[in-house]
Curated annotation (Swiss-Prot):
Provenance organism: Yersinia pseudotuberculosis serotype IB (strain PB1/+)
Entry protein name: Spermidine export protein MdtI
Transmembrane stretches, start-end: 6-26, 36-56, 64-84, 88-108
Gene it is expressed from: mdtI
Topology in membrane: Multi-pass membrane protein
Localization of this protein: Cell inner membrane
GO CC terms: plasma membrane
Alphabetized UniProt keyword annotations: Cell inner membrane, Cell membrane, Membrane, Transmembrane, Transmembrane helix, Transport
An example Gene Ontology molecular-function term: spermidine transmembrane transporter activity
The organism's taxonomic lineage, starting at the top: Bacteria, Pseudomonadati, Pseudomonadota, Gammaproteobacteria, Enterobacterales
Quaternary structure (record): Forms a complex with MdtJ.
């Protein structure tokens, strides 16, 4: 297993945070009816991919991408719940649990 260094992990955390911001802004843009929020969402996605590109310099691509996607989805679910009162049904919860279990398995491999 590859030993992780601080800077790649910091860039991965930044990538996850920017992805969450992008998703929230996209929802708030109301299908790009609020253009500035839509533009900020696109800029956040660009920043997220740029941070992910830096993260994969020190973290294996499969691990970094799985962590970025998985944590991004889980945190977006939480943000949707808190900010927009969106709830998952039982199938959604099962999917989220499987996603998190898959992330753990990839990291342990």
């Amino acid at each position: 297993m590859q030993q992780l260094e601080f800077y790649p992990i910091a860039f991965l955390i930044l990538a996850v945070m920017l992805e969450i911001v992008a998703n929230i802004l996209l929802k708030m843009s109301d299908g790009f009816r609020r253009k500035w929020l839509g533009i900020l969402s696109l800029l956040s996605v660009l920043g997220a991919f740029s941070a992910l590109a830096q993260a994969v310099k020190g973290i294996e691509l499969s691990v970094a991408y799985a962590m970025w996607g998985g944590f991004g989805i889980a945190a977006t679910v939480a943000a949707g719940w808190i900010l927009f009162n969106q709830r998952l049904n039982y199938k959604g919860w099962i999917g989220l649990i499987l996603l998190l279990a898959g992330m753990v398995m990839i990291k342990l491999s």
